[in-house]
């Protein structure tokens, strides 16, 4: 896809949302390995908002709608588990049709607020990053303990089999 086609597609997807202002910048974020991700700036008068727009990779996720349904189920569950003192959970913005994704040009797109000062690591520079990631993953697993698994669909075979994934991780670390 050319840059002009990419720009046209992104603008068409964003038109499905009730967003304030006009698009003042679109930057493709190249770190990350799965989805096509863009940082979008919107300006209205003297205010700028930053959003993250993603196209879900339908090669990795054969049915991207299952991914979005899982996210919706997890968000609904966590919204009832967390209080105001807990860390936030990313929510995808509903489009004008009230859906948390937009279908366009054969792709499934989703939009969420940009998290200021967020970092995506391509490589880990110190062990504290790994400790923090492990803590966050463990906390996430603990928070989901009461979520009925039948509410989630299998998006990748074995993806939700945490013991098997941990065995693979430990095997790879040896």
Give the predicted meaning of each segment.
Residues 25-43, 47-174:
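Conserved ATP-binding subdomain of kinase catalytic cores across diverse folds
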Residues 1-27:
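Juxta-kinase regulatory segment immediately upstream of eukaryotic protein kinase catalytic domains
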């Amino acid at each position: 896809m050319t840059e002009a086609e990419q720009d046209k597609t992104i603008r068409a997807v964003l038109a499905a949302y009730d967003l304030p202002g006009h698009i003042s910048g679109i930057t493709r974020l190249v770190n990350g390995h799965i989805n096509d991700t863009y940082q979008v700036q919107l300006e209205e008068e003297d205010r700028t908002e930053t959003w993250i727009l993603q196209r879900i990779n339908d090669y990795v996720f054969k049915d991207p709608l299952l991914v979005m349904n899982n996210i919706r189920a997890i968000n609904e569950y966590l919204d009832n588990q967390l209080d105001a003192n807990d860390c936030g959970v990313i929510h995808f913005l509903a489009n004008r049709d009230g859906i948390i994704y937009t279908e366009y040009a054969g792709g499934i797109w989703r939009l969420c607020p940009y998290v200021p000062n967020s970092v995506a690591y391509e490589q880990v520079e110190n062990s504290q990053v790994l400790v923090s990631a492990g803590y966050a993953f463990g906390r996430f697993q603990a928070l989901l303990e009461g979520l009925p698994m039948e509410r989630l669909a299998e998006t990748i075979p074995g993806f939700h089999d945490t013991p098997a994934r941990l065995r693979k991780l430990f095997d790879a670390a040896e």
